[in-house]
Amino acid sequence: MSARKIDLEEADVLVLFGATGDLAKKKLFPALYSMSLNGSLQCPVVGVASTKWDHEQFAAHAFGAINAAFPNPDAEILARLDSELSLVVGNYEDESLYADLAEVLKDKRSPVIYLAIPPAFFGNVTQGLAKVGPVSYTHLTLPTILRV
């Protein structure tokens, strides 16, 4: 298996495991805003998390992170992001989470899945995704972890 750059223009959905966590807050949501600003994010974003939040709480988390990184964010971009954000909640070890996610992704053909979760959960998540049946073309992206 070789690493290659993933072009989000190919994706019809971006799935973020760990969407309510620290990595998403500090890095991913500001990056998604920046990508929206320059037009390179053209797909919905589905967060996956164990935190039991509704849409408003999830959006507040995302927009709080964006506001911290960009003091005067574009209201139109935020409104578009809000309309494209959704959250699937469940335990990473529970098969029902993956069934719920599969239902959300049923019409998608080219998802990019980003694991912003502790490495200890990678096995559970990849096995859970495999059990519900892969979509025709999926990119699985892991954050680079450096230890010094």
Model-based region annotation:
Residues 41-81:
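Glycine-rich phosphate-binding loop and adjoining beta1-alpha1-beta2 segment
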Residues 70-110:
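A structured beta-alpha segment of the ubiquitous adenosine-cofactor-binding alpha/beta core
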